Amino acid sequence: MQILKGMTWDHSRGFDPMVASAKKFNEKYPDIRIIWEKRSLQAFADRPIELMAFDYDLMVIDHPHVGEASRKDLIYELNKSEKFEDQLKSLNNSSVGLSHQSYNFNNNQYALAIDAAAPVSSFREDLIKNIPQTFEDVIKLAEQSQVMWPIKPVDSISSFNSIAANLGYPINEKHEVFLDVSVGKSILKMMKDLAELVPKECLHMNPIETLDYMSTHNDISYCPLLYGYSNYSREGFRNSLVH
C-alpha cells in the first residue's frame, strides 16, 4: 500500500473534511492511504512552506504562500495535465468570489479552494439588539466593552485591506501605488481608535480564539472584522451560537 502524508491545521474546519475525503478516496483506491497530520494555526503559519513541501505529499495552505511556492517550484501545477482541465474550469465557475483564482499565480493553478474565508462581522444574537451599521456604531458599542477584534499583525493587515475596500479604495495588484497616503492614514486612525477600546488581549488573538471566546462567554456581543467560521453558527458546536 502507498502511504501519502498530508499536513493541515488544528481546527475542525481544516482537519475533519480532509480526514473524511481521505476515507472516501481510500474506498475508491484501496491501495493508497492518506494520513493527515495537524498543527496549531500559528505553528502552521510560522513554519516555512519550503520545509513542509519536503516532508509532506499534500498540504492545506493559505493563498499568500502561492507566490513563494511558484518561485521555488515547491508545489505541482494542477493545470499541467489536460485531464483536469474541465474540473478546474468547473471549480473556477462555482467558486465563491475569487477563492479559486487566489491560488493561481503566473497562469498556474497551485491549489484548490477547499472552503472560502472572507472578512465578516460576527455577533451574538442573544446579546445584541441592534447590530452596528457604521464604524461609528462599532465605536459606541466598544465604549460599552461589548466588542472584541483580533488584531495580531496578520489579522490587522486583513482588517486594513477590508476597511480600504469598504471606503472605496480596494487594494489592486494592478495599481502602481498600494494606497494613497492620506487614505492609509485615515484607516490607521480608525483602527487605532477602535484598538484602544477593545480588550488588550485582542493584540495577540486570532479569529479562532475570538470566536471561541465569544461562543463560551457572555460579555462580548460583537466583532467587526475577522475571518468567519460557519461552525460557530451551528447548534452544538459551542455553548452559544455566533453568527
Please report, for each region that a protein language model flagged, where it lies by residue.
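Early extracytoplasmic/lumenal segment of secretory-pathway proteins
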Residues: M1-G67, S90
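Short helices/loops that flank or line small-molecule/ion binding pockets
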Residues: F44-D55, K72, K140, P207-C223
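Hinge/lid segment of periplasmic solute-binding proteins
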Residues: V66-V120, N130
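Short, solvent-exposed loop/beta-turn-alpha elements that line the ligand-binding surface or hinge
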Residues: E82-L91, S145-Q146, G168-L188, R234-F237
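Extracytoplasmic/periplasmic solute-binding protein
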Residues: Y110-A113, P119, D137-L179, V183, ...
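Short helix-loop capping/hinge motifs at secondary-structure junctions, enriched
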Residues: D126-Q133, E196-L197
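Glycine-centered hinge/linker elements that transmit conformational signals in sensory
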Residues: H175-P207
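Extracytoplasmic/periplasmic substrate-binding proteins
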Residues: L197-H243
